[in-house]
């Protein structure tokens, strides 16, 4: 969301007056209460979009927020107070869909991502397409082979694994899940 918002803001080229965020249902579910990286605990969809606008560096893609400053965080809080943010379900039926629309005083922009966090499939400025590429959701996007995830196999793995080989991964997951739960 932050990446798409940073792209849309760059495309807009002026102060933001309105933001519409369209997301596929699973993204809404997963992001609505998650901590936004590099924000000191800011949470949710609107926070992710606002910090992308105020401190995001779109050219860094997944690291879009890696250089966020405290000043950027304060500006994003002010932006959320001042600007109308609307969050809606995406018009696309994709498993992964993010569409950001922005309006300024004189311009508008729209950025669409599909399939994954960095797959930009369309950019528009003032209604005109400035970038477009075809996207077709593959049927295997909808399912992952989980046939090995039986209770028996999970218990067997847990009882036999060398904990030192998985400690870092498990501790990281505990940290992430704790942040989400808080």
Language model features: what each stretch is:
Residues 60-84, 164, 178:
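Glycine-rich, flexible loop motifs
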Residues 18-58, 77-83:
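A structural-propensity feature for long, helix-poor, extended segments
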Residues 42-62, 91-109:
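C-terminal domain-closing interface element
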Residues 16-19, 96-98:
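Residue-level recognition of the N-termini of beta-strands and the immediately preceding loop/turn
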Residues 7-10, 51, 179:
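Charged/polar positions on well-ordered alpha helices
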Residues 1-3, 40-44, 48, 67-74, ...:
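Conserved active-site and cofactor/substrate-binding residues in soluble primary-metabolism enzymes
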Residues 80-182:
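Signature of multi-pass transmembrane helix bundles
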Residues 1-14:
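Alpha-helical support elements that line or immediately flank enzyme active sites
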């Amino acid at each position: 969301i932050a990446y798409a918002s940073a792209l849309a803001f760059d495309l807009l080229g002026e102060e933001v007056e309105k933001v519409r965020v369209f997301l596929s249902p699973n993204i809404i579910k997963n992001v609505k209460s998650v901590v936004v990286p590099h924000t000191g605990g800011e949470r949710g969809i609107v926070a992710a979009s606002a910090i992308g606008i105020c401190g995001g560096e779109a050219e860094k893609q997944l690291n879009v927020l890696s250089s966020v400053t405290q000043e950027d965080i304060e500006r994003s809080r002010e932006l959320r107070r001042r600007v109308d943010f609307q969050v809606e379900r995406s018009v696309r039926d994709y498993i992964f869909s993010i569409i950001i629309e922005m309006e300024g005083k004189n311009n508008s922009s729209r950025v669409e991502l599909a399939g994954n966090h960095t797959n930009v499939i369309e950019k528009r400025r003032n209604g005109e397409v400035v970038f477009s590429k075809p996207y077709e959701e593959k049927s295997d996007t909808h399912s992952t082979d989980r046939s090995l995830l039986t209770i028996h196999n999970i218990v067997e793995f847990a009882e036999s694994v060398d904990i030192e080989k998985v400690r870092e991964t498990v501790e990281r997951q505990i940290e992430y899940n704790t942040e989400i739960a808080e």
